[in-house]
Swiss-Prot record:
<keyword id="KW-0678">Repressor</keyword>
<protein>
    <recommendedName>
        <fullName>Heat-inducible transcription repressor HrcA</fullName>
    </recommendedName>
</protein>
<comment type="similarity">
    <text>Belongs to the HrcA family.</text>
</comment>
<dbReference type="InterPro" id="IPR021153">
    <property type="entry name" value="HrcA_C"/>
</dbReference>
<keyword id="KW-0804">Transcription</keyword>
<dbReference type="InterPro" id="IPR036390">
    <property type="entry name" value="WH_DNA-bd_sf"/>
</dbReference>
<dbReference type="GO" id="GO:0045892">
    <property type="term" value="P:negative regulation of DNA-templated transcription"/>
</dbReference>
<dbReference type="InterPro" id="IPR002571">
    <property type="entry name" value="HrcA"/>
</dbReference>
<dbReference type="InterPro" id="IPR036388">
    <property type="entry name" value="WH-like_DNA-bd_sf"/>
</dbReference>
<comment type="function">
    <text>Negative regulator of class I heat shock genes (grpE-dnaK-dnaJ and groELS operons). Prevents heat-shock induction of these operons.</text>
</comment>
<dbReference type="Pfam" id="PF01628">
    <property type="entry name" value="HrcA"/>
</dbReference>
<keyword id="KW-0346">Stress response</keyword>
<dbReference type="GO" id="GO:0003677">
    <property type="term" value="F:DNA binding"/>
</dbReference>
<keyword id="KW-0805">Transcription regulation</keyword>
<dbReference type="InterPro" id="IPR029016">
    <property type="entry name" value="GAF-like_dom_sf"/>
</dbReference>
<dbReference type="InterPro" id="IPR023120">
    <property type="entry name" value="WHTH_transcript_rep_HrcA_IDD"/>
</dbReference>
């Protein structure tokens, strides 16, 4: 389910059972409270009796390994980024979703929900991940090639129309297009009827290829303005007027990231994260991260160059279509003290359901 990072394997050999237990307690305390854990409180948590002085000696060794640090003099210890990565790889036990959690995810993301619009499904999936994780939920989808079931052109203004494409699973995609000057409502209907009669049952790229093959038929059945309208509709649906990048990123739960902020440094890091999420390059990067290995990927702090300055963690998994092509990704972004063991199965199950929905 989770792709581990091989870079921390060597650290495990440097820890004995006692050191490992102390390290684990420090990290778990940080993930729960965000506060440093001191030697006196730590000694009370251990299953075996160990004096605070002995605990401090072990903590010193863990600091030498780069796994923990002291935020200021005479404070307790917090895990470093390396420490968090090592904890995730060596100590984290991925939990199981409860029946209630699985049911909650299925209510939002389920193959039986095909009658809802793609936009609504993506938004609800993102909102659901946010609510269950207390981080920011994200869903990315690439431009897909739905099989056409029905087309309609609806005039909005003298020079604009809504081009409506209904896919084979009744998913609806709407685009506003510029109309050829002088086109009539009757010509809008003729253009839609031509597409439905000659081109239904194909994907948009196939439609454009087929249109070239039936140009003689087009000339015989449609006038020049209607031909122009058909070509404009296919062009905007296929994304030829864009740059071919992922179609949309939906992020919900940004307010969750405001909780627990302390001082201007935290606020500035959050601002940088929000700025990163608005950049189109970020969509490509997140998809590339999801594609870089099977299963759920976990990126902590600067391991993910996209969010390295904001000090955020990303848990992400791809979802696939019927041809096993990656067509999007789902995930959670939040502070480095995310509840990784709980969020990983949540993201994994959501990605599985999104894959079923995409088939």
């Amino acid at each position: 389910m989770v792709l581990r990072n091989p870079g921390t394997k060597g650290i495990a050999s440097a820890l004995d059972e006692r050191s490992g237990e102390i390290f684990r307690r420090i990290v778990e305390s940080y993930l729960e409270s965000g506060e440093p854990l001191g030697s006196r409180n730590l000694s009370r948590l251990l299953p075996v009796s160990l004096s605070p002085a002995s605990v401090r000696n072990v903590m010193s060794d863990l600091e030498d390994l780069g796994l923990i640090y002291s935020p200021h003099v005479s404070a307790g210890r917090l895990p470093t980024q390396l420490g968090l990565r090592f904890f995730v790889d060596a100590f984290m036990q991925v939990g199981n979703l409860s029946p209630e959690e699985r049911a909650s995810i299925e209510r939002q993301v389920h193959p039986g929900n095909r009658d809802r619009s793609v936009e609504n499904l993506l938004t609800e999936a993102s909102q659901m991940l946010s609510g269950m994780s207390r981080g920011a939920g994200l869903v990315i989808t690439t431009k897909s090639d739905p099989v056409l079931k029905h087309v309609e052109f609806i005039r909005l203004a003298p020079t604009k129309a809504l081009a409506v494409l209904v896919g084979e699973h009744d998913q609806v995609e709407n685009r506003i297009i510029e109309l050829p000057a002088g086109i009539t409502s009757a010509q809008l209907t003729e253009a839609a009827n031509f597409v439905n009669a000659h081109l239904a049952g194909q994907t948009i790229p196939e439609l454009r290829t087929q249109l070239e093959k039936v140009k003689e038929t087009v000339r015989g059945e449609l006038d020049a303005l209607s031909q122009d309208l058909v070509e404009r509709g296919l062009a905007i649906w296929s994304g030829s007027e864009g740059d071919g990048q992922p179609a949309r990123l939906i992020v919900r739960g940004r307010a969750n990231l405001l909780e627990g902020l302390e001082g201007t440094d935290d606020i500035e890091r959050l601002r940088m994260l929000f700025d990163d999420l608005e950049k189109k390059d970020s969509l490509i990067e997140i998809l590339n991260l999801a594609e870089s290995g099977p299963g759920v990927r976990i990126f902590i702090g600067s391991e993910n160059k996209l969010f390295s300055l904001s000090g955020s963690s990303l848990i992400v998994a791809p979802y696939r279509d019927s041809d096993d092509r990656i067509v999007g990704a789902v995930g959670v972004i939040g502070p480095t003290r995310l509840n990784y063991s709980r969020i990983v199965p949540m993201v994994d199950y959501t990605a599985q359901l999104m894959s079923r929905l995409s088939r």
